[in-house]
């Protein structure tokens, strides 16, 4: 049943992309892509590789291994690959932690702490920028305000789980009370409770170990740099197609499109992000066929290229990573 559901979601994603291409006009999109400045597109691709490097540096800084750039790059790419294949990118942090356990030699709780801290800053910065957009751009005020409120709420929830031990344990206890209603043996439930509560305590303890002004300031700067580099990538794709727009408009479009990707039940926002980006481009005055071309090329760089790299890296370590998952599950059942 789960495999069929995943297949349906993937098929829907592909159908949305095909619908976008048909709506914008395949021949016009091909012509626009052919006429684009491929040198600028290549620079945009390099910029996105730089984004992955910055994210790897941030990950390495949090876990105390900033010098292991190659390993950190691989761990982050594997995590992004998992996020691209899961609804709301929900599997990214877990796979990051598992890959970090194997490649960085850290504890699973440390990897989860690092992943949640990264998500905390990414959502916090995004929420702040969306709030600013809601104030400054009336045409998208409602959706930007909704996105800002949602981002702040999720950021606050991450704060409770990743920094506040008492609150984090209380949240899990409520979730555990729901799990208890499932047809699971009492021994397994007890093992699950002990493993997860000790994991939450370890995760929060590790988070607090680097929660000082200097460390959090560095993480914030790297997170902001990653955001701005992603916006620069999209801005360069606009330039490649000869479309003139302000950098502030690109930031707003990128924020709103990412909001759709986070909320979407489709894997990695596949299909929904392409459609939302093209629609937002049209709202900001970009012709339809160019809007579709820009959206598709940007997603090839930011989504499909990362997915391909992540698939390559994951294939090298898939057996070892899944051995970690299997041993964890067996420990719970034991």
Curated annotation (Swiss-Prot):
Keyword set, alphabetical order: Cell membrane, Membrane, Transmembrane, Transmembrane helix
Membrane-spanning segments: 7-27, 33-53, 120-140, 142-162, 218-238, 247-267, 277-297, 300-320
Keyword Transmembrane helix: yes
Keyword Plastid: no
Subcellular locations according to the entry: Cell membrane
UniProt GO cellular component terms: plasma membrane
Membrane topology: Multi-pass membrane protein
Pfam families referenced in this protein's UniProt entry, alphabetically: LPG_synthase_TM
Family per similarity comment: Belongs to the UPF0104 family.
Annotated protein name in UniProt: UPF0104 membrane protein MTH_378
Organism: Methanothermobacter thermautotrophicus (strain ATCC 29096 / DSM 1053 / JCM 10044 / NBRC 100330 / Delta H)
Native organism taxonomy: Archaea, Methanobacteriati, Methanobacteriota, Methanomada group, Methanobacteria
